Amino acid sequence: MALQSNGQIKISDIKTELGSTDNSLEALSNDAGFTAPHAMSDFYGYSAGASNLYYWNFGENDGGASFTGNAGTSPGPFSFSLWIKPSWAASDTNVLLFEINANNGNNTDRLMLIYDYGFNRLVFRYRAGSSNHHLNWALNQNAASGNIGRWHGSSRGPVNSDGFAHIAGTFDPTQTSAANGLKLYWNGTAFNTTITQANGTRANFAKTHMYINVAFNGNGDRNAEYDNIAFWFNRLLTSSQISTLYNSGAPITAGDAGLATGLGFEAAAEGTSLVDDTGNWTNVSAGGSRSTY
């Protein structure tokens, strides 16, 4: 339910709309995705449940998207959330849904989520130097992903009415065991069966380059649609907050979910180009185009 468009708005009204217990206007404004100077009038007509109108459509081998920025060197805590509709062919191999790295060109210092088509698994990995810290989840062994045999345009698993799945994850680098520190969710439901893990170092590295929807071997990208790609570089989301982002299948921004605090990157595809709405990262290139739901 949207807030009123004129007249007096109360802090209590804003708290109810955001589902927040905070009494600070600045904190509430940040959670809604507004910037300074913070004013009550920013909330005229605001709705925490506003749905998106557009998504980003990548064609096969049109380059994916790349950004430059600076998320510091700390390994975390780190959280991500994105919506994806795979349209790649059943013959494709590996897809990097995202990668954040130090741009050193030697396959080290990378934070990533990979879909390995050959083994039908999602791999959430923090790679510091040549040391991997990761978990692998087989899609055919997890009810959250519908136990699908392969993930592609004709086998998407559980999706919303537009064919999109919500994928989210968290990384707690204070945990030496990857099984304790890495979590993955599909449509707000946690994966509970892992197949392999590596408990490598969680050392610092610079996080200055970001890639969305690129082939793991560097040969272009995959045919897929994305929306609301968000990263928190110093915040560990709870399972309840991830459920809020899932929003019963309706993509919303982090601000609409009341989770803008600590947000380091968000591309919601509502503009004419794929840009970081937080202003922290600069778009270097983006293949594909905006499409209407």
Give a label for each model feature.
Residues 57-132, 175-179, 216, 233-242:
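Extracellular glycan-recognition modules
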Residues 127-166:
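Short, aromatic/His-centered strand-loop micro-motif at the edge of beta-sheets
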Residues 163-182:
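Localized edge beta-strand/strand-to-loop motifs within extracellular or lumenal beta-rich domains
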Residues 204-227, 236, 248:
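Extracellular glycan-interaction patches encoded by glycine-rich segments
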